[in-house]
Amino acid sequence: PVVAIFRGTVDTFLDALIILGAGILVLVYLFADLGGLSLDVKSVDALLYKNWFWWGLDLVADGLVLIYVAGSWYLLATIITGQKLFMENVARAALMLELLVSWMVWSHHLLADQGQPEMMKLISGEMVTAFELLTQGLALFITLVTLWKARPLKMTNELKYLLGGLIGFGLAVPAGIIQADMAMNRVLHNTQWIIGAHVHIAIIVGLYMTLYSAVYVLWPHVTNNAKLWSQKLANTHFWLHLIGGIGMGAFMGMAGLDGMLRRHMYFNGEFDLMMILAGVCGAMVLLAWIIFLFNIIMSIGLKGLIGIFLPSKNKESSYGI
């Protein structure tokens, strides 16, 4: 976890610099145009700008999300099992390898860009990107083996949601590798596959369920061992979120395979069935969140909820805040 924090912090700093610089350039041209000053757009190389922008923005997904999530898996697995992480040295090495990988994979966003050099598409966009299947696959494997070696384990909320997070990334990462193939990208580029099968499942299932696991690990520490109001609601939340999140991404991905573009309006009902099914699954995720929120509020009570935002009467409990 400490290595993951260090790794993620490096990419956070770099990402902030790159995106800030890219954004300032846009604002310069925007305000100049509003002020009646016409700047020469050709003075900025469009291809260089796109590479600069995607190098920075890609650090968010390929550097920050994957690394912070992997670090969270390791921490959660050791807390849940009470045992040392399996292959701890390899886990550290994989996190550091991802540092280099995340800096060199941005071209997978430019595989359909005609101006992007073909060699950069092949090496950065396809070959180096494939290493993320190795680095994240190692993180998933190490976490699962750590849990396996500690069996029998009680299927607690934190364990269930951790497994749900592993399932999410176990589906989303290969979906991303598939679309990072130069041939498959011809079919999948800018379609609902990208935002559905890859992004939605990674974030809604992989990231969110990992965070829910962390919530249940922290629950007794931040509530003075308050009892969860309803375990049945916690179970309902789990299944609705898992099935709804995977279903939403899957149906969007199926529409993408049939050619449905993202950021595009369709008026003739070509993809209505898949979008309706994706919408139903999305509603399941929303309902799951409402159930989770209701269960949390009922567990701490309205007085406890309001008390979160009030100063503590115990001076020691708020020391340093």
What are these regions (language model features)?
Residues 226:
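Catalytic-face loop-and-helix region of soluble metabolic enzyme cores
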Residues 43-55, 188-193:
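Juxtamembrane membrane-water interface segments that cap and precede transmembrane helices
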Residues 118-119, 140:
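Glycine/proline-enriched, intrinsically flexible loops and inter-domain linkers
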Residues 152-153, 159:
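Cytosolic-side membrane-entry/anchor segment at the start of a transmembrane helix
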